[in-house]
């Protein structure tokens, strides 16, 4: 059996009562105090996630921008220095290699933050598709990453740094910021639907920053609540809402797919064809009318015809409703449409509802 990978925070997990699981080859906390309590902490106050398992890939060189324009779906030329941008990396057929965030450090230097389980695959794909004068380096082992999320995030982090955090706009970042005496990069971003920050530092310093933030009375949060939070906010999870077989258009991520940008990007032609032909399936939100929780890969029916598949589902800790996301044949994907979800041996009534399920008050 392969030994599970561990983040630099791993030695501290037991101290805070973590229950760990194998997540994509990493030994990570699924919960600390409990998923519902952790979810509520992030929605109402703040919570701290260890996300050091995420991958970081450095792209440097005079042709970095044109290379990333070729590799990624969004318009890289629109990113200003000190800003980040959500992106999709596609295969030629329009399927998804990964979804990721691009940080622009300078005109010739970018950091791509990718999903942990995809880091090696992404890195190989990027190297395989190098164009022009660029170097691509997997620097994941050098970084620790924490996410402080929730309405109180700014107030709490402000106690540990001299930087005016209110000056950082959404998807903006500042480098060389001291947090608890440690040099960090702070980005106003996250994966919860709340305000918050993602904080990058040298791996060796991650534990110090983690404990300094928790000492301010913040709850540590595990993967269980990370999943319920992102699902309520309808943020895609690779392997569920996106995969090599699911295009970003089917997943409803059109805002990150710039089919009109001048540069050709890998998958552009296939995505243009898909859009022109009309999508045959699309991602929708569902809510169960009868008892039961929709789960990944459960079939969806209309009468006795299978018309789709659940990609993610849970009981919403915020609303108490049983919600999910499903890829549904476009003909049956209208708001209010009643469907049935196959849960074990029975069909449970559901309806298509407006998404996101949760949107924070500005």
UniProtKB/Swiss-Prot annotation:
Keyword Transferase: yes
Protein name stated in the entry: Aminomethyltransferase
Gene name of this polypeptide: gcvT
Chemical reaction(s) catalysed: N(6)-[(R)-S(8)-aminomethyldihydrolipoyl]-L-lysyl-[protein] + (6S)-5,6,7,8-tetrahydrofolate = N(6)-[(R)-dihydrolipoyl]-L-lysyl-[protein] + (6R)-5,10-methylene-5,6,7,8-tetrahydrofolate + NH4(+)
NCBIfam families for this protein: gcvT, PRK00389.1
PANTHER family to which the protein is assigned, alphabetical: AMINOMETHYLTRANSFERASE, AMINOMETHYLTRANSFERASE, MITOCHONDRIAL
Enzyme class: transferase
Entry similarity comment: Belongs to the GcvT family.
Any one of the GO CC terms: cytosol
Pfam families linked: GCV_T (PF01571), GCV_T_C (PF08669)
Signal peptide positions on this chain: none
Species of origin: Listeria welshimeri serovar 6b (strain ATCC 35897 / DSM 20650 / CCUG 15529 / CIP 8149 / NCTC 11857 / SLCC 5334 / V8)
């Amino acid at each position: 059996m392969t030994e599970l990978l561990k983040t630099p925070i791993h030695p501290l997990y037991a101290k805070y009562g973590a229950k760990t699981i194998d997540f994509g080859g990493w030994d990570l906390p699924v919960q600390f105090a409990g998923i519902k309590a952790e979810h509520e902490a992030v929605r109402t106050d703040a919570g701290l996630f260890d996300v050091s398992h995420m991958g970081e890939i450095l792209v440097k060189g005079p042709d970095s921008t044109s290379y990333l324009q070729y590799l990624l779906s969004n318009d890289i030329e629109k990113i200003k220095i000190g800003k980040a941008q959500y992106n999709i990396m596609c295969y030629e057929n329009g399927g998804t290699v990964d979804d990721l965030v691009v940080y622009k450090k300078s005109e010739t230097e970018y950091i791509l933050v990718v999903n942990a389980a995809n880091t090696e695959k992404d890195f190989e794909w990027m190297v395989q598709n190098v164009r022009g004068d660029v170097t691509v380096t997997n620097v994941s082992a050098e970084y620790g990453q924490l996410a402080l999320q929730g309405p109180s995030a700014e107030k709490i982090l402000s106690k540990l740094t001299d930087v005016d955090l209110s000056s950082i706009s959404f998807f903006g970042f500042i480098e060389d910021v001291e947090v608890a005496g440690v040099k960090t990069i702070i980005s106003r971003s996250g994966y919860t639907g709340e305000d918050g920050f993602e904080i990058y530092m040298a791996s060796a310093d991650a534990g110090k920053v983690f404990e300094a933030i928790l000492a301010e009375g913040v709850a540590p949060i595990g993967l269980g609540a990370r999943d319920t939070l992102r699902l309520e906010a309808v943020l895609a999870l690779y392997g569920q809402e996106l995969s090599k077989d699911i295009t970003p258009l089917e997943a409803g991520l059109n805002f990150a797919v710039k089919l009109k940008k001048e540069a050709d990007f890998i998958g552009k032609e296939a995505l243009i064809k898909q859009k022109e032909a009309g999508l045959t399936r699309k991602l929708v939100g569902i809510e169960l009318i009868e008892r039961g929780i929709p789960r990944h890969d459960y079939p969806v029916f209309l009468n006795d015809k299978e018309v789709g598949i659940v990609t993610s589902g849970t009981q919403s800790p915020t609303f108490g409703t049983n919600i999910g996301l499903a890829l549904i044949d476009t003909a049956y994907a209208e708001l209010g449409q009643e469907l049935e979800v196959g849960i074990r041996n029975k069909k449970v009534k559901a309806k298509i509802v407006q998404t996101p399920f949760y949107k924070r008050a500005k």
